[in-house]
A protein has these predicted regions:
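Charged phosphate-binding loop/patch that engages nucleotide di/tri-phosphates or the phosphate backbone
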Residues: 127-148
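A short acidic/small-residue loop/turn micro-motif
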Residues: 28-29
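Conserved N-terminal beta-strand and adjoining loop/helix that marks the start
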Residues: 1-20, 40-43, 64
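Unchanged
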Residues: 41-64, 72-129
Length: 148
């Protein structure tokens, strides 16, 4: 099977309570799943620019996403049904609190990404529905800011 390359920026949005924002996807062709904010890098965009754009579009938060904190290569089928090999770059954004607005969601996102919530690590570990990345808890632990 040929997979299309898909550069993508993903955001680990973490509030002051240590909870991570996740979106619930309900595609027509598979069971629901949860995912961090983010998406494909548009032509001419850097990963950093894509992270900032995706953060604004999906959450309403307009700010710099800081440096890349992780990178993964993953294969999956997009919501549109395209088989891809994604080069995902992760950016961590820590906020005191944030009320998500879906005002920037595309028509497709409005249809398949109808809910979101903030998860603690314990809630993620006990959650019945799949979430991506599957090693999110380890990724959050590895990117936790250190205080000197």
């Amino acid at each position: 099977m040929i997979r299309l390359p898909r550069p993508a920026a993903r955001i680990l949005l973490v509030d002051a309570a240590g909870r991570t924002l996740m979106f619930r996807f309900t595609p027509d062709d598979r069971p629901p799943f949860w995912c961090t904010p983010g998406g494909a890098v548009d032509p001419g965009e850097s990963y950093e620019q894509a992270a900032r754009r995706e953060l604004l579009e999906e959450t309403g938060l307009d700010r710099d996403c800081g440096p890349q904190v992780a990178r993964r290569q993953v294969e999956f089928r997009t919501i549109e049904g395209v088989e891809v090999e994604a080069d995902e770059r992760y950016f961590r954004v820590d906020v005191d609190a944030h009320e998500v607005t879906g005002a920037g969601h595309t028509a497709l996102e409005q249809r398949v990404m109808q809910s979101w919530r903030w998860f603690s690590r314990a809630e993620l570990a006990a959650h019945a529905e799949p979430y991506f990345p599957t090693d999110l808890i380890d990724l959050l632990d590895a990117t936790e800011p250190t205080h000197v």
